[in-house]
Amino acid sequence: MTQAVMLQGTASDVGKSVLAAGLCRIFYQDGLRTAPFKSQNMALNSGITSDGKEMGRAQIFQAEAAGITPDVRMNPVLLKPTSDRQAQVVLMGKVATNMDAVSYHDYKPRLREQILAVYNSLAQEYDVIVLEGAGSPAEINLRDRDIVNMGMAEMAQCPVILVADIDRGGVFAAIYGTLALLHKQERDRVKGVIINKFRGDVALLYSGIEQIESLTGVPVLGVMPWLDVDLEDEDGVALQNDKYRGNAPRDITIAIVQLPHISNFTDFNALAAQPDVRIRYIRRPEALTDADLVILPGSKNTLSDLAWLRESGMADALLQTHRQGVPVMGICGGYQMLGDTIVDEVESGLGTQPGLGLLNTITRFAQDKITTQVNATMSGELPSWLAAAAGLPVRGYEIHMGETVLQEGCCTAMTLQRNGCSVADGAVTADGLAFGTYLHGLFDSDAFTRAVVNGLRARKGLAPWETTFCYAEHKVRQFDLLAEAMRQHIDKIYTIMQQHQEPV
């Protein structure tokens, strides 16, 4: 029988996704066929499977930790917020509809049977399933239609481990309060607690651990220290917590504009891992002053974020920075914003709007979303600081609902191989100071990334780095470091799975 264990949290961003990846890595190292599963994920960081399905990035990197190919069954429901009240609903990797929160809450019971069927299908193929909840199981206003926390644990008939973040303070209150708000049958599923992100001498916690175990009857399985591991974050909460402010001095500074609806900021993890690069996510115009490159990232609401750029003064500052000779790059929604004109009758309904005008392009939004993994080749001739990237192979994925047409004065940045056909993508100006593409994951291509960074180094009179950093090997090292730390600090996971597994 397939064994399963589920991680739920006292709140969002307590570290469930990373610890789930660590469990996937441990079971993989121990020779068990393991898969991650999250029934419903709300995130703007998504990726594309080999068969063109869209799923949450968290389950993609958990699958990588487990040594398997990501499968959309690992995340059957993906919610991508388009505003404070609306979200795009992606079912089994394809866009279904847009809904507000109330409509989706009413819709959830219809998903329960489908989610269970998908889970059972996955469980038949693996020895272990590592499930992840969302937010907290103590959201009592959502309990009656829950499909992602205790509702999912009930469907999978699996034990639950509660993860609590001590770094934000109030960890014992969070543990006690969460367990107190659960129904008895839900509380009985919780077989242990992990206290996560601890800094300092763990001996200071012992008396508190004894008391919380006595008060709740639930054992603390371990205290995970704050780990300096470089792994993906599920969504923008990490940006709000200043994790990526990048204060360490490096030769090259890259400023990424933190749009209100920023998506796929995992595009820049490989850049951040470069030994000579400092990444800074910025929201204030004055923060552009020391940038060697400015990047406009993806957006789930392009025109809304473009309006924010103008209202915040960021657009004027970005254009001024560009006039001073600093290159500006756009990816997906950011690429669209760099153009002359955006025609949107789909996403926002705002019609025709002017872009920033750095690329002579016109973008028209469409109803159908392109979701595919692609191989590509950079154009054979690229100007200025991009010249070393000319002709290089790159790989990535597309997630967009717009088509961008180049006008006079722009050259194609690369050629994609999409479904067996060659497709032109991206645009670059003659001076190389404005460059855009729809290709997410571009910087995971090591040779391209080093060529770009060395081009920026040359602009500053710095010698190039001859050694190319291998991001794939770096990720493997991070998975192994995480697994080693979890083995050292957490007990009884195997015992819990073996003793508390129920037949589905």
UniProtKB/Swiss-Prot annotation:
Record-linked PROSITE patterns: GATASE_COBBQ
SUPFAM superfamilies, A to Z: Class I glutamine amidotransferase-like, P-loop containing nucleoside triphosphate hydrolases
GO BP, sorted A to Z: cobalamin biosynthetic process
Keyword terms: Cobalamin biosynthesis, Glutamine amidotransferase
Catalytic-site annotation from UniProt: C332 (nucleophile), H440
Domain GATase cobBQ-type stretches: 251-448
MF annotations from Gene Ontology: ABC-type vitamin B12 transporter activity; catalytic activity
Pathway involvement of the protein, from the record: Cofactor biosynthesis; adenosylcobalamin biosynthesis
Pfam families listed in its UniProt record: CbiA (PF01656), GATase_3 (PF07685)
Entries under NCBIfam families matching the protein: cobQ (TIGR00313), PRK00784.1 (NF001989)
Stored HAMAP family: CobQ (MF_00028)
Family listed: Belongs to the CobB/CobQ family. CobQ subfamily.
Role according to the record: Catalyzes amidations at positions B, D, E, and G on adenosylcobyrinic A,C-diamide. NH(2) groups are provided by glutamine, and one molecule of ATP is hydrogenolyzed for each amidation.
Protein name: Cobyric acid synthase
